[in-house]
Swiss-Prot record:
Listed name of the protein: Ropporin-1-like protein
UniProt domain RIIa: residue ranges: 17-46
InterPro entries in the record: ROP_DD
Species, as recorded: Homo sapiens (Human)
Function field: Functions as part of axonemal radial spoke complexes that play an important part in the motility of sperm and cilia. Important for male fertility. With ROPN1, involved in fibrous sheath integrity and sperm motility, plays a role in PKA-dependent signaling processes required for spermatozoa capacitation.
The protein's assembly and partners: Component of the axonemal radial spoke complex 1 (RS1), at least composed of spoke head proteins RSPH1, RSPH3, RSPH9 and the cilia-specific component RSPH4A or sperm-specific component RSPH6A, spoke stalk proteins RSPH14, DNAJB13, DYDC1, ROPN1L and NME5, and the anchor protein IQUB. Interacts with FSCB; the interaction increases upon spermatozoa capacitation conditions. May interact with AKAP3. Interacts with CFAP61.
Length: 230
């Protein structure tokens, strides 16, 4: 015989005072992050919250690119989330990193493909993984370094996106070493040319304007120089 439903009055139901704010913050986080699998992401969110770890939450909403119509691929925003969760460690265990990857609803196949660029066994240097992620976002070395600067910078969004030249040169050398089309001589020559400007400023920082030139601006510059020659 089924038990009768128990009736409770309002005075008997205790709602933790912090619950409304927790749910409010969770809802805002879900809207900003737009996870492909809400249940999986929610499990990762509350697991991180209970441990006091950085949450798997984007700083802002991202519009999916033409190759990411369902927003399930790696983006700069998701890579920045991983950086917030892992940057305090010099080396990250692959099992822990893979779990964080899954919590962001990213395909396991893409995680494996990324690691195949520079195979390792149980753990990876975080800055190396971040560099590999940036290379997956951008086709060229300079585009990958652009993503790196925008993720690591302390400058406000839309600013010069400056990072220490020491970090920039380490990542450039690391990615160039994995690219068979770039010789060590070309790498060192390029970094030396950048370092001249950095040393002149005496702040040890490099920003996007020092090395990244969008194609449109480059074409305009070429056209202007041709006009001057006529």
């Amino acid at each position: 015989m089924p038990l009768p439903d128990t009736m409770f009055c309002a005075q008997q139901i205790h709602i933790p005072p912090e619950l409304p704010d927790i749910l409010k913050q969770f809802t805002k986080a879900a809207i900003r992050t737009q996870p492909a699998d809400v249940l999986r992401w929610s499990a990762g969110y509350f697991s991180a919250l209970s441990r006091g770890d950085p949450l798997p939450v984007k700083d802002r909403m991202e519009m999916p690119t033409a190759t990411q119509k369902t927003d399930t691929g790696l983006t700069q925003g998701l890579l920045k989330v991983l950086h917030k969760q892992c940057h305090h460690k010099r080396y990250v265990e692959l099992t822990d990193l893979e779990q964080k990857w899954k919590n962001l609803c990213l395909p396991k196949e893409k995680f494996k493909a990324l690691l195949q660029l520079d195979p390792c066994e149980n753990k990876i240097k975080w800055i190396n993984f971040l560099a590999l992620g940036c290379s997956m976002l951008g086709g060229s070395l300079n585009t990958a370094l652009k993503h790196l600067c925008e993720i690591l910078t302390d400058d406000p969004e839309g600013g010069p996106a400056r990072i220490p030249f020491k970090t920039f040169s380490y990542v450039y050398r690391y990615l160039a070493r994995l690219d068979s089309d770039v010789s060590p001589l070309e790498t060192e020559s390029y970094l030396a040319s950048l370092k001249e400007n950095i040393d002149a400023r005496k702040n040890g920082m490099i920003g996007l304007s020092d090395f990244f030139f969008p194609k449109r601006k480059l074409l305009e510059s070429i056209e202007n120089s041709e006009d001057v020659g006529h």
